[in-house]
Amino acid sequence: MRLLYVIHQFFPDCHSGTEQYCLAIAREARRCGDEVTVLSLHWDYNRSKPAIELFEQPYDGFRVLRLNHWLEVNPNGVLRDYENLHLEGWYRRVLDDVRPDAVHFFHMRQLGSHLIPLTRRLGVRAVVSLTDFWFLCPRFTLLRADGALCEGPPDGGRGCVACDQPDLAGAVPDAARSAVWSPGARLRALLDRPAVQRECLLQADAVFAPSRFLAELFAANGCAHPRMDVVPYGLEPGRIARAAVARPRTPLRLGFCGVLSPWKAPHIAVAALRAVKPPVALRIHGRLEEPMFADYIGALRAAAKDDARITFAGAYDAKAASQVFADMDALVVPSTWYENTPFVVLEAFAAGVPVIASDLGGLREVVREGHNGALFPAGDAQGLAAAIERVAARPQWFDADGFAAVPTNAAGYDRFRAAYAGS
């Protein structure tokens, strides 16, 4: 079976959870004898290449087509996020070249959801994996500007104005969408976004969500696709080796692994340590050079600088992951946004490490109090401190033999493959 996997960014330039998942499923497809080509956007901020250009940059043995897209081709940044009709001809060229039996969309930001119905019109099956809230939220996080949680586009999208584009509060929307950079054009694009995204998503042949929470949230926002199925994330076989470690140790070794962003909320873990009574240490793993979060990371380091128990260990690669978890007694996931199932949680379970997580989103589906970790109210440093103390006081919670087996991607790929084939 010939397959085209479409994603908004890809290795080696970008390697967050969505890219990792796309690569893992591509490897599973290859193991099954299927042929995968990846189409990824190449975000061009400075016009270092022709405005739009298709070029190849193989990765991990896969053919990877990169579509260079100078952002100013569509200066309306609100519209560019979800609709770029000028890319349709380039996409047709890719389909003519690859001739796939199915296209699997992993993320479509800055490419455009209109590629879903276009794929169907061209006689190719279109499958979508939901990996975050981009189809619902222009900020893709379902977090309002003040950090509060959102349940979906309020007031048909009008509620998104104050949150995502506050400077448009007094603007008058244009009559039709256009690529023009003007208040009226941007407001029209923002108001049209919910309906366009919903209409395009519902035209897919099949839609997959990694958690019941995500599937139910999309259904509540009018995106109850008749072929919506839940396929939990899995790990590649052998990704994490479980070390023979006697847990818990003294001091209790806590770890945070992930992007140092406000919604991943390592600051909650830093604040919680001040209230924890038993001896404890925290290693924070994540890139310290993130331009988008430079101010946040600076404040985080300042908050921790006088606490010798806290170490900033930087990022690590896949080869080092097993050792990172071997050195850890419990993983802390203090996210303040709706997580699905972060891969780092599955990696922790595979390593025999319990997880202390926010009681939000898909985390509630995999972290079970007293079995493989503990839950606490999101954003509550005192609640996290109490959860850490509960775990520290119960050595039996560190018995990894009681953890449920971590799924691999094989079962999920079987369901994807059935969707590719139309069954």
Question: What are these regions, as identified by a protein language model?
Answer:
Residues 1-57, 63, 96, 122, ...:
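N-terminal subdomain of nucleotide-sugar transferases
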Residues 20, 261-275:
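A conserved mid-protein helix/loop that constitutes part of the nucleotide-sugar donor-binding site
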Residues 42, 213, 234:
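Carbohydrate-associated surface elements
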Residues 47-56, 220, 283-309, 320:
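Short, structured helix-loop element that forms part of the nucleotide-activated donor/catalytic region
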Residues 219, 225-229, 234-251, 323:
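Acidic anion/phosphate-binding donor-loop and adjacent secondary structure
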Residues 333, 345, 354-357:
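Short hydrophobic beta-strand element within catalytic cores of glycosyltransferases
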Residues 369-370, 374-381, 390-395:
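Conserved acidic donor-binding segment of nucleotide-sugar-dependent glycosyltransferases
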Residues 395-423:
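A charged, aromatic-enriched C-terminal amphipathic alpha-helix characteristic of glycosyltransferases
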